């Protein structure tokens, strides 16, 4: 819940000086990206900008305090301020900020700018007291904000010092409007107008000018001169002499003498007590000060000119001038030290009654009241956890003694979830074990089950599925139905474990249950996770169309609940890319993989490994080996600079081994094979993939017998567990083994099985990646004209993809190849005596690749009649009469030159 006063522009008071010369300068602010108003405290920054902002409807105001260094809090208020300015135009950004569903401030701001692109009128955001921001992450995000904000957007920043916002760069590019302390200082004319408004009897212009010079035009000093003259009935000049040369750091003594000592005891105590509040309203004042009518008292203090300012148009919320408020809080610690804890307790109680638990925690911490802090956490901690107030919760839990946590074990559970959210897995188990050992008496069974649910999540995250399954089952056996969050966690973990064990149907059922529970209780990140898992399971079962439809539901959930910034969004677009790749929709697959990288742009580069692997796959399927090599260099660099889950490594190794196969790099394959781990099992698609990598490397090295043993065992497991997509992949690799080892009949048999299974999976690229060996077999099958209709159609589609992407098949017949061929000792005499032209060599390569006459004409951009002439000439030179004879002749030439066809 946001405090309204932090989003309210200060109210302009009737007696406030209107700074016409400065307002004239600010009137051109819409021509700049940033309007920066800087000066020490008390120079009238806020007053000036509030005057300028008066009458501007499309302006948001955000007043900072020390608590705004928390990124999530800063984001929530900033977006809320822009929502006020735009009348709710940026609803997606608002929802993401409220639910903490963004990867970083930068990514949230990027979404904000997408929405603001549809806002075409001038728009302003004022951020007051920016000097309170010390968090470098926020500084970095605001630099990003300034670089990318729309042209019709002006950011107005008020600060006591020069903020870390790339000011020099903006200044050089003339995108910065600056007002500093020298300009904010009152000149002689303004000082005269000021005193004429504040003093009962006018003073001479020369006297006014002298006083202005004495205090260097400092607005706070001028205000104190007028206040002192009214309270003490002394001359203004006397006060001016006392303030001459003084600055904010030496003001305390003066304020004691001239302000606090000149009000009655009741007012003095009111000022000191109320100063502990960063913002205040009637209810807070009544509780903190004991005054019966807080609103009336605030208005009275305001009339006395005691540096109190209204924070909203309704006059409900007030705050002290920062300089005066800081002074009062310091004096309160000295004068009311004994009462201070009780004052903070009263403030905490009032904030709780008004529904602001985070503000209440601030005062409970200041009071040092562990019992009050504990009670607030017991009632509100999980709500704060779900809104990602993690830093505040961590600070609060550290302030509680361990004994208090043991007496309230749910707070121990909260602390453990905090650790889990920060990936401190070993600390989670240590904390829970210690708590179980030291909790007095018999531990509540439900709480123990909640501990086990969390432990199960930690175990699966840490790569220990057996322990995760044991703990998840224990938790589900003991958890009441009402304990929905822990039941969702345990059900999800159990489903994930079964997925790892290859029990796909039962895993799918549990993930569907998880989705239903998570949707019912609005636990959206688990709902999304369960959909992603369902899609992976359906893909493994070979039901790729069902996987696609599940992904569509997941994308819809992301859109409805504004989950675009969650890292899980990358997981979803990645598995969508895998599916698109399988169906040979390579451009879409690449775009999806790149969008996954964009989601992770604010994370460590190592997180992008999986999407980078997919980019390599796309290049390999296109036959673009140069691009694949470039991407592999980056991938291998990431592999060497991080620790990864085994399935991440398996996917990365897959594209490396395929690249070595396509380039004939046996040395790299042999080196990898010596060092790569060999899993004990192959009962899920992760482990099947790693064993398939091993078999592919063995085939490349000519180790056909061990590769066949591996693949036969993989197929047995895949059939047993219904891992149909893996079976399809295994059959294709087995086909390559048989083909290369000369077992043509076996190769044809398993290829037919693979084509039949592809009717279910829809696989295309898995065939294409095998290149020319696959193309040659498919040509033979098509020529036999015995394939069923669906398999015939798929074979033709695969062949077209190979012909389109794998240009190296006829690139062999380039000038360099032809020159080497003609110099080969075994070249047929007919070719040596009647050499083909370069164009005829190109035509032969395209015939060999399965192109029709029309396709060859299109490829070479010549007329079909010209192609017929080229074909007639090359047939005559080769001594062949039919197209199939030409194909066989080309194949013999390639074999002679050492190409494995």
UniProtKB/Swiss-Prot annotation:
Residues 829-894 form the HTH luxR-type domain. GO terms for molecular function: ATP binding; DNA binding; DNA-binding transcription factor activity. InterPro entries: P-loop_NTPase, Sig_transdc_resp-reg_C-effctor, TPR-like_helical_dom_sf, TPR_MalT, Tscrpt_reg_HTH_MalT, Tscrpt_reg_LuxR_C, WH-like_DNA-bd_sf. The keyword ATP-binding applies. This is HTH-type transcriptional regulator MalT. Belongs to the MalT family. ATP binds at residues 39-46. Keywords: Activator, ATP-binding, Carbohydrate metabolism, DNA-binding, Nucleotide-binding, Transcription, Transcription regulation. Monomer in solution. Oligomerizes to an active state in the presence of the positive effectors ATP and maltotriose. Positively regulates the transcription of the maltose regulon whose gene products are responsible for uptake and catabolism of malto-oligosaccharides. Specifically binds to the promoter region of its target genes, recognizing a short DNA motif called the MalT box. Residues 853-872 bind DNA. The gene is malT. PANTHER family: DNA-BINDING TRANSCRIPTIONAL ACTIVATOR DEVR_DOSR. The keyword Transcription regulation applies. Activated by ATP and maltotriose, which are both required for DNA binding. One of its GO terms (biological process) is positive regulation of carbohydrate metabolic process. Pfam families: GerE (PF00196), TPR_MalT (PF17874). It comes from Salmonella gallinarum (strain 287/91 / NCTC 13346).
